[in-house]
A protein has these predicted regions:
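Canonical Radical SAM [4Fe-4S] cluster-binding loop centered on the CxxxCxxC motif
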Residues: 1-47
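Core AdoMet radical
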Residues: 12, 31-43, 56-71, 84-101, ...
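Radical SAM enzyme [4Fe-4S]-AdoMet core and its adjacent flexible, acidic
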Residues: 37, 124-217
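Acidic (Asp/Glu)-rich catalytic clusters
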Residues: 52-55, 83, 105-114, 133-141, ...
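Distinct, well-ordered alpha-helical segments
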Residues: 73-78, 98-111, 130-136, 156-165
Length: 217
């Protein structure tokens, strides 16, 4: 199936995979849940996805964590329970270990490129995680995007230079720069005045599109 032709109907559903990431990103809103993961298991994931497919056969599904790529074989089993009519997104740090290198990770993700709409890869100005080699991005055939959170350092003098180097590093790749979304509300999501991150981005890049509320309905 051509993933670009999939339609979306119904709410986006986020599934927290049953694997902790062993990281401590300060903006993570899920870490507290993984302090006790006794209620997480794969069978519950399967049942939830099967039920979801019956209720919302055309909605978006997001795998997040924790770390969805902590167990690649289990990830493939979970993907198999996502119906072909869904858009599937995976949030990951692309973790490597002695049991899985970048080639193994790329092999698994590429094998499911017809199912995966996008792999969202966490990379930040501050290194909160152990990052694998950037060579992996040349190995990935599946669509992928670099997600960078500017946490509380948008005002720091060094952030501008770091961000420019970051964008040069990932030149040619999709990059999403965002603030700590746990601070967003329906009231402030469209406010740009006094927004340190928005000011920083306007200082180094040309912003070409208006903030249209219609796009967020």
């Amino acid at each position: 199936m051509n993933i670009m032709k999939k339609i979306k109907e119904g709410p986006t559903v986020t599934m927290f995979v049953p694997y902790d990431c062993n990281n401590s990103c300060p903006f993570c809103v899920n870490k507290e849940e993984y302090r006790n993961s006794s209620s997480f298991d794969l069978d519950r994931c399967y049942r939830s996805l099967d039920l979801l497919d019956r209720i919302f056969p055309h909605n978006d599904v997001v795998f997040t964590g924790g770390e969805p790529l902590a167990e690649l074989e289990a990830l493939e089993d979970i993907i198999a329970h996502v119906g072909e009519t869904h858009n599937l997104y995976i949030n990951t740090t692309l973790p490597t270990s002695e049991n899985q290198d970048i080639h193994r990770i790329a092999e698994v993700l590429n094998r499911h490129q017809d199912m995966i709409s996008c792999v969202n890869v966490s990379r930040h100005l501050k290194h909160y995680v152990k990052e694998c080699s950037d060579e992996i991005f040349d190995l990935l055939k599946v669509r992928h995007r670099i997600n960078c959170v500017i946490f509380e350092d948008a005002k720091e003098p060094s952030t501008k230079e770091k961000l420019i180097k970051f964008l040069d590093r990932f030149n040619g790749h999709e990059v999403q720069i965002r603030a700590n979304y746990s601070n967003l509300t329906l009231e402030n999501v469209f406010e740009t005045e006094g927004d340190d991150l928005f000011d920083l981005l306007c200082d180094i890049a040309e912003y070409q599109y208006p903030l249209e509320k219609e796009l967020f309905r």
